[in-house]
């Protein structure tokens, strides 16, 4: 059995850990609101961007001059998985859930005879994926030094993806990230970026015909690269909010668990101390009776 001194040290250590997890929870809570507002503000723009492009693409998708970012290169053999995760841990299943979804998609494609490559955004995703797919990771972008995620960060990633597509390194690109729903709910999401999946009009919706100046193909040639950056930017903002939500929830659970451990350890300490005092009293009384 541990001595009383060892028990006191253990209780003090648990209390110190509880202070750290509580502080991390408060920091995550303070940053979550801003991150959530940024993610929610980006959603309407990204969704409207997709809707506009889908409308224009409806007329251009079948034309010979349709941009390759829209129509693709006609092949479906090499898939690039753009996996966006966080730079830090201590956030529950936030990072692992995104990686798990990407890993499942990779194994599914490989079982079909497809070639899979990875483009990692975020240190945690890279560290997990390289255990199984080290030779298949063709690029890795870390944002540890970025204090606040900006559109320029998404543009840089989009330019790298487009350059590799134009170089013929892959045929299809799918984005993986975590969509923020609430503090306790973040949804791992997969979204195809290249070729762009055109959303069909809802059932019962009357299709509207537009005339564009300049031609649809020319408009799309300018819009599609920007849309790619917009969708990546949205994913980064959703990830940021999801990270702080997951971290806040994880640290709250850790703080509660630490409190429960302290309660149990204190109870054991008090019982042990009481037993030692009782034993000493019995020895004193027995000695007095012997005299």
Swiss-Prot record:
Which residue windows are coiled coil? Answer: none
Keywords per UniProt: ATP synthesis, Cell inner membrane, Cell membrane, CF(1), Hydrogen ion transport, Ion transport, Membrane, Transport
Q: Where in the cell is it found?
A: Cell inner membrane
Q: Do the record's keywords include S-adenosyl-L-methionine?
A: no
According to its UniProt entry, one GO biological process term is: proton motive force-driven plasma membrane ATP synthesis
What Gene Ontology cellular-component terms does the record carry? plasma membrane; proton-transporting ATP synthase complex
GO terms (molecular function) for this protein are:
ATP binding; proton-transporting ATP synthase activity, rotational mechanism
- Quote the Pfam families the UniProt record gives: ATP-synt
Instruction: Give the way it sits in the membrane.
Output: Peripheral membrane protein
* UniProt family annotation: Belongs to the ATPase gamma chain family.
Subunit structure of this entry?
F-type ATPases have 2 components, CF(1) - the catalytic core - and CF(0) - the membrane proton channel. CF(1) has five subunits: alpha(3), beta(3), gamma(1), delta(1), epsilon(1). CF(0) has three main subunits: a, b and c.
Role summary: Produces ATP from ADP in the presence of a proton gradient across the membrane. The gamma chain is believed to be important in regulating ATPase activity and the flow of protons through the CF(0) complex.
Q: What is this protein's name?
A: ATP synthase gamma chain
């Amino acid at each position: 059995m541990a001595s009383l001194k060892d028990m006191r040290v253990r209780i003090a250590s648990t209390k110190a850990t509880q202070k750290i997890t509580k502080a991390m929870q408060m920091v995550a809570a303070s940053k979550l609101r801003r991150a959530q507002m940024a993610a929610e503000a980006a959603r309407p723009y990204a969704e409207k961007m997709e809707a506009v492009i889908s409308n224009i693409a409806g007329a251009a998708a079948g034309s010979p001059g349709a941009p390759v970012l829209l129509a693709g290169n006609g092949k479906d053999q090499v898939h690039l998985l753009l996996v966006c995760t966080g730079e830090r841990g201590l956030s529950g299943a936030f990072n692992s859930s995104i990686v798990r979804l990407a890993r499942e998609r990779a194994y599914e494609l490989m079982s079909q005879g497809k070639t899979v490559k990875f483009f990692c955004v975020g240190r945690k995703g890279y560290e997990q994926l390289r255990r199984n797919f080290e030779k298949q990771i063709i690029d890795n972008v870390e944002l540890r030094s970025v204090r606040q995620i900006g559109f320029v960060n998404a543009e840089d990633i989009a330019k790298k993806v487009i350059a590799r597509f134009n170089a013929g390194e892959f045929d299809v690109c799918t984005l993986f990230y975590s969509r923020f729903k609430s503090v306790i709910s973040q949804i791992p999401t997969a979204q195809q970026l290249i070729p762009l999946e055109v959303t069909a009009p809802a059932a019962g919706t009357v299709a509207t015909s537009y005339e564009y100046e300049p031609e649809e193909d020319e408009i799309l040639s300018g819009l599609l690269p920007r849309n790619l950056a917009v969708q990546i930017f949205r994913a980064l903002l959703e990830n940021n909010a999801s990270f702080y939500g997951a971290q806040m929830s994880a640290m709250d659970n850790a703080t509660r668990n630490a409190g429960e451990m302290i309660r149990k350890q204190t109870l054991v300490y008090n019982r042990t101390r009481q037993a030692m005092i009782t034993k000493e009293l019995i020895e004193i009384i027995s000695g007095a009776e012997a005299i």
